[in-house]
Every structure is written in C-alpha cells, then in structure tokens.
Amino acid sequence: MDYLEEFPVLFIDDELHSDTAEGRASREIVKELKDEDFPVIEALTARDGLHAFLSHPHVSCIIIDWDLTPEPADGMLTAADLTAIIRERNPKVPIFLNTEKLAISAIPLGVISRIDGYIWKLEDTHAFIAGHIKRAAKNYLSDVLPPFFRGLMDYVEDYRYSWHTPGHMGGVAFLKNAAGRIFYNFFGENTLRADLSVSVPELGSLLEHSGVVGEAERKAAEVFGADRTYFVTGGTSAANRIVWLATVTPGDLVLVDRNCHASVMHAIIMTGAIPVYLMPARNDYGIIGPIRSGEIRPEIIAEKIRRCPLVEDPASHPVRLAAITNSTYDGICYSTERIEENLREMVEYIHFDEAWSGYARFHPLYAGRFGMRRSTDPADPTVFATQSTHKVLAAFSQGSMLHVRQGRGAVDHARFNEAFMMLISTSPQYTIIASLDVATKMMAGHSGKFLVEEALEEAIVFRKKMVAVAEEIRASPLSPENYWWFTVWQPDCIMDQETEKGDQVLQEDAGCWLLNPDEVWHGFDGIEEGYAMLDPVKVTILTPGIGADGG
C-alpha cells in the first residue's frame, strides 16, 4: 500500500496564490510534492486551515506560514493558535513553520515546543524542502500502524500463495462461480487475502497470545488501563463466559445484577453457580435503573444469602464473584469505586459487564465510573471489565476485549487461558483481531479523548435540539389535539430556562448528569448522592402518550 497517496500534506499559507516571491516559492514547493504524487491540501486562511485539519485528521504533515494575517472573520486566529489546537488533537503529526531565519528569535517558546522545525522557502531549493516534508511524513506514517495490523498487511502484500486453511485460498475459490465472483468483488481482494489461519507463524497465535497478537494485546492493556487484556472474537457474550469459567466453580455463591445479559445467565448454568440477585430500580416509564447502593451493603447481602433456598449453610458459603452491568442499556453508569468499597470484604472478584461503555476511560466526564480505574491497594478485589469494542468503538462485529485489573483474587494466566480457549475458535477471524488492534491505536494518547468529546458534543446538540423543537411546536398556533412531539429522558438542567447549562459545562461536569435523590426527572427513589450517572451519549426518547406515572 502506498501510504503517501492516502495521507496528504496540509499547506496553510495566505500567500499561496499571491504574485510575490513568497507566494511563488510556496507554489513551487506544492508543485514538487504533487509531481511526486504526493497530495496537497491548500488553505489560504487560519480558519480554513483549521477546518481542513479537522475534516482531514489523517494528514501526514502540516506547513503553517508564521506570518499568517489574523482576520476578524476568522476570530483573529493566529499561526500560534493553530499549532496549539493541532498539537492538542494530534501530538505526533509533523508541524513545520514557514518563516525566515531572522524571524525565529521572535517565535515564543510555547510555539517552538509544539513544532518539528522550520522551512526557509526563500533560501533552500524547492526540491530539497519538498523532500524534507516527504521524509517527515514518511517517518510519521511508519508509526501509524499498530503491530498486528501491520503484520497482517505485510503478509497480504507479500503476494504469497495460500497452502493452508481457509478453503477459499485467499478468495480464489470464489472466482470459480458467478455468485462467488460477485461475493469476491463486493468484499474485495484484501479482505479475502487477509482471511488467514493459525498456520501463519508470522502473525502469532491468539490462543497462545504470542507474536504480534500478544504484542497487540499488551498494547491494549496499556491503553485501556488493565494489567492484562485478552482479545475476544466471539463478542462480549463469550468474554463474560470466559470470566466465569476461569473463576467460578460448581456451588459457588455469586452476586448477580438481575439486569444482566443473557450470557451471564448462561455462565451461571455452565459453572453451576448459585446466584443471589441484586434487584435494580425501575421507574414508571419501564426504564431499568441502577441497583440501589443499599442493595450492595454487606448486611443486606448476608440476609439475601440467608433467605436463598439453594444455600443450605450460609456461613460456609462465601461469595465468589459479583457481576454488575455498567453501564445499562439506557446509559446508567455507577461509581465503580463505591461498588468496590461496598463489596471489598465480601468478594474476591468483581465483573463489570461494560459492553456499552468501552470509551469511559478516555474522558474525564466518566472519571471513577469504569472498571479499569487505578487502584494501588492489593487487597482490593480483582476486577474484570468485558467491553464490546465493536458496539461503541471502531471494530468489526464480535470484536470485544476482556480486561483484568489484578487484586487479591488470584488470576493464573495458564488456567485463565484454558477458559479462554474453551470459547475461542482455533480458526479466529483475523480481520476482527486487526480491528481490535486498530481500535486500540485510535484510542491511544490524545486521540481517544477527542473522539469521545466529539460524540459528547453531538449527543448534547441532539438533546438540546429535541427540546427546542418541542418548544417551537408548543409556541405554534396548533390546537392541543394536533400537538405532539417526543421528549428526552434527561436532567432538567439540559434546557430548563432557569437551570440550563452551557454545552461546554455539560461536556465536562459530571454533576450535570447525576441521578440526584432530590430530582424527579429520573423517576427512581432511594438513589444515593453521586452514586449513579446518566451517560450523555445514550439518549432515551420518550414517546407521546406515556406519562411519568406510567399512564
């Protein structure tokens, strides 16, 4: 693959089209790059350059004219402002300032720390400057690909014959039939050539976590804050069962969120565990809310165990594991720290099913509301977080991750891996593994925060627009019987005239989204202060005709 054709250079210079020495020099540099089939995006103002960067985040190098003229229409955006915004979103893309040697002394240290160098377009030759830009872009792109995906691409692009499974032999078998030819054309040759088997030693083994697969899993653990991460190609359904098969034995007592996924119920059956259910709240809309914190207190759990008809001798049955859904389908996420505090003395293992919240670690709005939070106390329970990467991040369907945060509950990798192998095919789909590897790369560093921030921005705009439309309809001359519109299940401060918060506050202040005990919007009683929060990204629409009382 020729990366250079896919990753353009962004040239921000207000003299690009001017009949000046600087303008002619800039055009010659651009021409040199284009003559070498290197695409260039041209921007004549700071604002246009910023928009070009935001709409083309895959640019491989950025050239900024230090003498860009700030314009009122651009909000007086300067070259220094551009370097700060770009560097905040991408800490590695090369940035060069187009300037003169004598002007360097006037460039602030803050700007110097954000750039990779200077270009003196009136002194060096155009060919040399273009080559310098191209080299910087190539160096940047050499680090773009994560380990497994890089290895997979290298193998596919090495034009090797397939002497192993799968039987379609790199897609060739599909070419022997009309339906197969259409299938081949639809999915493309690279997809089919990348459908490989464990017979390719260069790519390591998912079952043994070796080679570039193991390297990719270790990188994922680092990015997602885990002590160890396993790539699961059977979705979070398989990941949930792996956790249970590795930690629970027949007759063990387990605490189970009654609002759990079917795979957790399957795990109970498969392991022969004895479930004690934690009942979540439910409001009059029928929305399932959080398990009240009172349900997770040791004395309440002890009473539940005493009343369980399957437990003959409660004193001889310690609780092995607790499984909590975080977040719920409607976006209720817990203070995981409080849950761990309540369960600390009762269980060795806590399993957070985070199928719908794999992005929470990457934005401060969700601080303390995900399983892979930092913990320095080895006496804390061991925590598992199973995440559907394919649901909420950029991965292929069935691509999930199983994260482990080691505590006092033993996790022997060899034993754990036996449970892993029971539920993972010996012929895993390599494109799923590659997508998990790429999802990790996308969330690493500053990128993860900004990807989540974009989702938050869009969700908040949507929430506010839904309310604004309702207000416009109410203000119209329609008769009451012709009036209807959807409402959004959300805190009043989103749009209430007296308490409305600004978009930036809503993106940064978790307090705006808490299920406070003195508020009626959520419809749950007995909720502890700061215990549960509504994820802004999960929008629940209430249809006309259903009242808050369920009528």
Model-derived regions, located:
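Short hydrophobic/Thr-rich beta-strand motif most characteristic of the beta2 strand and flanking loop
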Residues: 31-45, 52
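Non-catalytic signal-transmission and effector/linker regions of two-component phosphorelay proteins
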Residues: 1-32, 36
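Conserved PLP-enzyme active-site core in the AAT-like
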Residues: 43-46, 69, 219, 239-249, ...
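N-terminal "arm"/small-domain region of PLP-dependent enzymes with the aminotransferase-like
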Residues: 126-210
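Conserved C-terminal alpha-helix-loop-beta "cap" of PLP-dependent enzymes
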Residues: 456-551
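Conserved N-terminal alpha-helix of the aminotransferase class I/II PLP-enzyme fold
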Residues: 190-238
